[in-house]
A protein has these predicted regions:
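A conserved alpha-helical element in kinase catalytic cores
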Residues: 57-99, 115-131
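Juxta-kinase regulatory segment immediately upstream of eukaryotic protein kinase catalytic domains
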Residues: 1-35
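Active-site activation/catalytic loop segments of kinase-like enzymes and analogous catalytic loops
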Residues: 229-258, 268-286
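Short acidic/glycine-enriched loop/turn segments that link adjacent beta-strands
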Residues: 41-44, 98-102
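Conserved short submotifs of the Hanks-type protein kinase catalytic core
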Residues: 101-112
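Active-site acidic catalytic loop and adjacent metal/ATP-binding pocket
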Residues: 39-52, 59-60, 183-230
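Hydrophobic/aromatic-rich alpha-helical bundle segments in the mid-to-C-terminal region
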Residues: 143-144, 282-295
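A cross-family kinase active-site recognition segment
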Residues: 2, 112-175, 193-195, 224-225
Length: 311
């Protein structure tokens, strides 16, 4: 569930048009000596480390402007350009909106995706989430939509199951409690309001643990405004997958320690329903592992929810 082994079939550096590669080199001020595609993630866009002829390294992301994910990439570029320098995120050096392609060049961050089953690496992630809440409250992007506006229509998986024929392979506990799950799911937006800039897609493959022990948070493609605790709770199923007492973690972490447990359960319920529904859709052609990831996420979150609710 960490996402580290979830790799889409990414565009490669040599698949970019010659004119786009030439413009990247021109703006970078040096020729590209080598390009290494980065593993992990579910987007099929280009994501690569570029080794430049003057000894510098940069990180490039690019996608065809007619691609179905182009709007997501554009949001990421716009968000990265407006993040404060104190945010634990790679700096955007420049972006290009050339005919046919969206391109972003970031500072290259050495490191590896954190392992949530390693106490020191998990501690670094948890410290970074506390830093995000402190640095990004109030939101430096006050014009963003709220999490209820962005995610309210999406996080209704249990309701859809309840209103239609539930899937034949739905687990017994979810089937037995479907109406109650749909009711609890419907309340999550009541608790989620806030003025923190949220990432909303924190996974280990969207973070890098640097050699100095600090975490860099990547891929700000789904930002919105909401309660500061949302990002930690959304990451918690990936932590729970390693057998860690996540209820205790939430009860002691500064971002979540004073949050009503009902609010946490409602949001977990909404996440579980979303993943349960999405995992049953056809897989995107260039991201074959996405539905498996969502199925695992649904299973872990539903199991945890059952223990929390004691239904």
């Amino acid at each position: 569930m960490d996402g580290n082994d979830n790799s889409a079939n990414r565009i490669r550096w040599n698949e970019l048009p010659d004119v786009v590669r030439a413009e990247i080199e021109h703006r970078s001020g040096a020729r590209v000596r080598a390009a290494t595609t980065q593993p992990g993630g579910f987007s099929h866009g280009l994501a690569a480390r570029l080794e430049l002829s003057d000894g510098r390294d940069v990180f490039v992301k690019a996608i065809d402007s007619d691609d179905s994910l182009a709007a997501m990439y554009r949001t990421e570029l716009e968000t990265a350009a407006r993040l404060p320098s104190t945010a634990p995120a790679p700096a955007l050096r420049f972006s290009l909106d050339t005919p046919g392609w969206l391109v972003a060049i970031f500072d290259y961050v050495p490191g590896h995706h954190p392992r949530l089953d390693r106490p020191a690496e998990l501690a670094a992630v948890l410290s970074t989430i506390e830093q995000l809440a402190a640095t990004l409250t109030p939101s430096p992007l006050p014009d963003l939509p709220t999490i209820a506006q962005d995610y309210g229509p999406q996080l209704q998986g249990w309701r859809r199951f309840a209103e239609h024929q539930p899937p034949a392979d739905l687990d017994d506990w979810s089937r037995r409690n479907l109406d109650k799950l749909a009711e609890l799911e419907s309340t999550w937006t009541d608790h989620a309001a806030g003025e923190t800039l949220l990432h909303t897609d924190l996974r280990p493959d969207n973070m890098l643990l640097r050699p100095d022990g600090a975490i860099a948070v990547l891929d700000w493609a789904w930002p919105c405004r909401g309660a500061a605790w949302i990002d930690l709770v959304a990451l918690s199923p990936a932590i729970a997958a390693h057998g860690i007492d996540t209820d205790r973690l939430l009860a002691t972490h500064p971002v979540t320690s004073d949050i009503d447990p009902v609010a946490v359960s409602a949001f977990l319920c909404a996440l579980a329903g979303y993943w349960a529904a999405k995992s049953r859709e056809p897989a995107p052609p260039r991201s074959p592992s996405l539905r498996r990831y969502q199925a695992r996420s649904a299973r872990v979150t539903t199991d945890w929810l059952g223990r929390r609710l004691r239904w």
